[in-house]
Amino acid sequence: MIVRVCMGSSCHLKGSYEVVRRFQELQKKYNFKLYGSLCFGNCSQGVCVEIDGRLFSRVTPENAEEILKKVLQNG
């Protein structure tokens, strides 16, 4: 699984650094590669995260694990 967190200016201002830190913690529990990414073009819905090609919006440190679980369950 590949997780890409938007590091564009809008997502940065909305907390992308904290989301990255949460995903770094979750790497200990789940097997995935984590990358920073340029803008996904969905700035008003940030923080945006792409997981295996699927775009997720309004990602927070609090809902990051729930999103990972959904992707793992649904493929």
Curated annotation (Swiss-Prot):
The keyword Metal-binding applies. Keywords: 2Fe-2S, Iron, Iron-sulfur, Metal-binding. Its cofactor is [2Fe-2S] cluster. One of its GO terms (molecular function) is metal ion binding. Not very thermostable. It comes from the Bacteria. CDD domains: TRX_Fd_family. It holds the Pfam family 2Fe-2S_thioredx. [2Fe-2S] cluster binds at C6, C11, C39, C43. Binds 1 [2Fe-2S] cluster. Might be part of a multi-protein complex, possibly involved in metal cluster assembly. This is Protein TM_1420. It comes from Thermotoga maritima (strain ATCC 43589 / DSM 3109 / JCM 10099 / NBRC 100826 / MSB8). The lineage of its organism: Bacteria, Thermotogati, Thermotogota, Thermotogae, Thermotogales.
